[in-house]
């Protein structure tokens, strides 16, 4: 429990005709705080795993509608929900192999259900962000089926087709270059019908579109317009920095590495110098309707690359915090580095978990060998919602959900079945398990058999149970998000690491012209004493929140005094009174 080292002070109480691609927009200097997505919190829903209403064991759009109040103003207080892909798909990459970008997969419901979801969400002040998979399609997409059938048809040049670079002595055609697949193995697949290779960064059933073909760009932007016309408020762009490849498809340089993918410098198959021009054209489409946003998923890149591709009002995911261990030195370094790289002119994102990575409750506690997973998850919630940038909260994190051990025969993640001595992979099924709504059979997720097994701890890690407990992780998230919404410094303030913070405490201030907020995390399972720093605004700090004691609030402490913090505790304080 958070406490002073002496007795505390008293409490005080869509579809449009094809059109020419627009010219690049002029990137204007951002005014941080002008837009909802800078101040707000975005909640990622994995539709298969959120709530099932028809008993088939797979989540659906009606299930999301039924639980909007959980994420809305009366619940978490989320500003927007991001839906992982809801489009028709053969399901070989669990929805990221899209066969039609313009409609809803019947597995999840109908177009009417989607329109009702938009309407019901908007009525609650919740915006809708769609996942756009535009780097590649399914090999069952009509575009690819037409493209593979003919070298001369209207879709012949829509994908990355190339002739072989030669032939082996036995006559086997050789790939055009040395590019490989992120999922292991070669990146080029031979198509007998065309007598050519096509490229795929991921599965062979996910052929890459040729974004340098103007017809591809026009079709994609038409699709974007269609979803905007249906009321969508934003887009998450899957692996967006891989859209453009080198015009000549040059081979990548080699380097030392632990897998075929890591043994290449990916200079020519992503991050092309004219990529920002393409994104500017995309942003022109989105910006035609006020209040819309987009966030790009940086595919296998650095924080410097993320900052470089963040311009104007565009967000880009960076993975620095998502990959950092629960270690004070590592967290201090990561927080300071990402803020310095983005600087004052670019707006970052913050994410600790998603559908491709271990849940942060499991990952962070394991990285420190800390058995108190709940305490680590709660302190990490403070980190997520108080560092500078737009927070993205993955469904179930508000309960402190852990990864679930999935036996290999139950895995629903194709690359996990390809693991060998030259290809390592973490089974993503483990972080995609169903949302537990109650302690009832099947956790209130379905009346049937869930598509993935539930975690063993749903008896306590479920919405109904935690909603009734003031000290639960869910209650903490509700308080945290409400506090953030009422505290401009936590939304749009500058970030300054606290100099002199050492040992196990990671501390930083968030400041606006009118407000100064101090955040401190004890990144250790051991108790610690920590001296509160001075503030140019005040000689006192008022406690706003403690992860160790839901009742602790309004205690005032003088700058320079020491406080005691429990293991894995985080506190938020505000400067009060004259300096």
What do the PLM-derived regions correspond to, one by one?
Residues 555-579:
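C-terminal beta-strand-rich structural cap/linker in extracellular carbohydrate-active enzymes
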Residues 534-550:
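Solvent-exposed beta-hairpin/edge-strand motifs
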Residues 11-14, 36-38, 248, 253-270, ...:
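Loop/helix patches that line or flank the sugar-binding groove of alpha-linked glycan CAZymes
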Residues 2, 11-14, 18-225, 229, ...:
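Acidic/aromatic-lined carbohydrate-recognition and catalytic surfaces
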Residues 27-30, 300-304, 332-339:
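Alpha-helical scaffolding within the catalytic cores
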Residues 81, 235-237:
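Hydrophobic residues within beta-strands of alpha/beta enzymes
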Residues 90-95, 305-310, 509-510:
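Short glycine-biased active-site loop of nucleotidyltransferases that positions the nucleotide triphosphate
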Residues 48-50, 87-89, 134-135, 204-205, ...:
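Short, solvent-exposed loop/turn segments at secondary-structure junctions
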């Amino acid at each position: 429990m958070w406490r002073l080292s002496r007795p505390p002070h008293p409490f005080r109480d869509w579809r449009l005709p094809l059109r020419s691609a627009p010219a690049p927009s002029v990137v204007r200097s951002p005014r941080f705080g002008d837009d909802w997505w800078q101040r707000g919190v975005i909640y990622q829903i994995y539709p298969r795993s959120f709530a099932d209403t028809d008993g088939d064991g797979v989540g659906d759009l009606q299930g999301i509608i039924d639980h909007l109040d959980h994420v809305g103003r009366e619940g978490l207080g989320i500003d927007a929900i991001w839906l992982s892909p809801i489009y028709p798909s053969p399901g070989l990459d669990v929805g990221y192999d899209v066969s039609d970008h313009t409609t809803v997969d019947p597995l999840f419901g109908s177009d009417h259900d989607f329109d009702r979801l938009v309407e019901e969400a908007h009525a609650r002040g919740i915006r809708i962000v769609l996942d756009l998979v535009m780097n590649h399609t399914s090999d069952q997409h009509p575009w690819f089926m037409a493209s593979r059938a003919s070298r001369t048809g209207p879709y012949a040049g829509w994908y990355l087709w190339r002739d072989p670079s030669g032939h082996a002595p036995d006559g086997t055609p050789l790939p055009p270059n040395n590019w490989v697949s992120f999922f292991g193995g070669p990146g080029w697949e031979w198509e007998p019908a065309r007598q050519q290779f096509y490229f795929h960064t991921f599965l062979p059933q996910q052929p890459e579109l040729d974004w340098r073909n103007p017809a591809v760009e026009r079709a994609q932007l038409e699709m974007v317009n269609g979803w905007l016309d249906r009321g969508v408020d934003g887009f998450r762009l899957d692996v967006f920095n891989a859209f453009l490849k080198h015009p000549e498809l040059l081979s990548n340089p080699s380097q030392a590495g632990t897998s075929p993918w890591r043994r290449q410098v990916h200079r020519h198959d992503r991050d092309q110098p004219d990529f920002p021009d393409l994104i500017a054209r995309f942003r022109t489409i989105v910006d035609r309707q006020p209040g819309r946003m987009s966030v790009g998923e940086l595919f296998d890149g650095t924080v410097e690359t993320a900052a470089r591709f963040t311009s104007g009002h565009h967000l880009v995911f960076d993975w620095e915090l998502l990959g950092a261990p629960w270690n004070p030195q590592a967290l201090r370094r990561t927080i300071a580095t990402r803020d310095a790289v983005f600087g004052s002119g670019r707006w970052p994102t913050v994410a600790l978990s998603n559908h491709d990575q271990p849940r942060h409750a499991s990952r962070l506690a394991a990285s420190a060998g800390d058995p108190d997973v709940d305490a680590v998850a709660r302190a990490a919630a403070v980190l997520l919602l108080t560092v500078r940038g737009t927070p993205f909260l993955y469904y179930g994190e508000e309960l402190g959900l852990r990864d679930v051990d999935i036996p290999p025969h139950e895995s629903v993640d194709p690359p996990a079945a390809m693991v060998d001595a030259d290809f390592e992979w973490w089974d993503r099924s483990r972080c995609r398990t169903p949302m537990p709504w109650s302690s009832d059979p099947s956790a209130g997720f379905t009346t049937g058999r869930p598509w993935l097994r539930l975690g063993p701890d749903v008896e306590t890690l479920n919405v109904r149970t935690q909603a009734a407990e003031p000290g639960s992780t869910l209650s903490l998230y509700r308080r945290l998000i409400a506090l953030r919404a009422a505290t401009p410094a936590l939304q749009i303030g500058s970030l300054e690491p606290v100099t002199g913070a050492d040992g196990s405490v990671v501390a930083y201030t968030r400041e606006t012209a009118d407000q100064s907020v101090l955040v401190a995390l004890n990144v250790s399972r051991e108790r610690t004493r920590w001296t509160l720093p001075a503030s140019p605004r005040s000689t006192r700090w008022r406690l706003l929140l403690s992860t160790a004691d839901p009742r602790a609030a309004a205690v005032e402490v003088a700058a320079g005094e020491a406080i005691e913090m429990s293991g894995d505790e985080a506190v938020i304080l505000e400067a009060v009174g004259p300096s």
